[in-house]
A protein has these predicted regions:
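Catalytic-site signature of metal-activated, phosphate-bearing donor transferases
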Residues: 1-50, 54, 202
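"A position-specific structural signal for the A-helix of alpha-solenoid helical repeats
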Residues: 34, 73, 107-110, 114, ...
Length: 202
């Protein structure tokens, strides 16, 4: 079960209700987490960081999965503010907090992908794929359990000249999303490139 925002409801109504709820009961760590997440959705990065750092400081905020999510949202906020070093540090904290979740590894892998740090992409996607039991909580995100880990690995392997391994990952990504035309195209291109290489080999 993947949790997504309800497209039939305007997000505009969520924020004032959450702010009011936190104002009325500042000891409710769950609502504080939700408020920080809503600030992230709105692009209010400083408010997100402030709110979720407060969430993490609360003695009642003990659920590791949710704490890791707060750390990931703080990391994304720093990333959007242009501070990759702080973003990296918060992603690593999220991994340490909940090493049983794929999402923190995948968030960091995506950041490293944008930075073209291919070895890092391969390491953290590999860590994510080593987690084979999918948690049944709202923290779990579909991307981390779909084609994305294999897709990023395909790109990283291709960029580092390992085309045969890239093809393996391209096929694995396509198996997760058979109707995706881009993934199908990746497989076709790599098969063609490898076929041409084999034909030109002495």
């Amino acid at each position: 079960l993947d949790h997504r925002p309800d497209p039939t409801k305007a997000r505009a109504q969520y924020l004032p209700l959450l702010e009011l709820s936190v104002e009325e009961d500042p000891s409710d760590d769950r609502n504080l987490h939700y408020l920080g997440r809503e600030y992230m959705y709105r692009g209010r990065w400083d408010d997100c960081i402030r709110t979720l750092e407060h969430h993490l400081s609360m003695p009642t905020a003990t659920w590791k999965d949710e704490r890791a999510a707060s750390m990931r949202y703080i990391a994304l906020s720093w990333l959007r503010k242009g501070d990759r070093a702080r973003a990296r540090d918060w992603y690593l904290r999220a991994i340490a907090e909940a090493p049983h979740l794929r999402e923190p590894y995948m968030d960091l892998a995506r950041m490293l992908y944008d930075m073209e740090e291919w070895d890092g992409v391969l390491y953290f996607t590999g860590c994510a794929l080593s987690i084979t039991i999918r948690p049944k909580t709202y923290i779990c995100e579909a991307d981390s359990w779909g084609s994305l880990p294999h897709d990023l690995r395909c790109q990283a392997l291709f960029q580092t000249g390992r085309r045969a391994l890239a093809l393996d990952e391209a096929r694995a990504a396509l198996a997760c999303a058979p109707s995706d035309p881009r993934l199908r195209g990746n497989v076709a291109v790599l098969e063609q490139l490898l076929g041409e290489t084999e034909r030109s080999a002495p």
